[in-house]
Amino acid sequence: MLSTSSNCSLEEVAEAATGPLWFQLYHRGKALTEMLVRRAEDAGFKAIVLTIDTPVPSPKERDLRNRFERSLELGNFRDLNLPRNEISGTDETPGWDVSRADPITWNDLEWLRSLSSLP
């Protein structure tokens, strides 16, 4: 399963993969969510897994202990012709701050399902 926050893009992983592809989608507002779903479909992904329980990424003890640093870019947001603050709500690395998207509702789920026939 490939995360929205992967360092590699959907397309890069699809090109290298030998097995079934699932995409873990973090809701990023309608425009970015739709773009990600379309790209997943076009790249040959077979399922969308929506994650809604991560409103704010937490500092994980193991990451702090191992001095993990966030990457400078996330593959799925590379080469977008949008200002960083339109992608993440801040001037931080695009895609890291999932808390900036509007909370997802049942209507949003219905809308998301209408975008694709993928399970």
Which residues does each PLM region occupy?
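Active-site entrance/lid segments in N-terminal catalytic domains of soluble metabolic enzymes
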Residues: 1-119
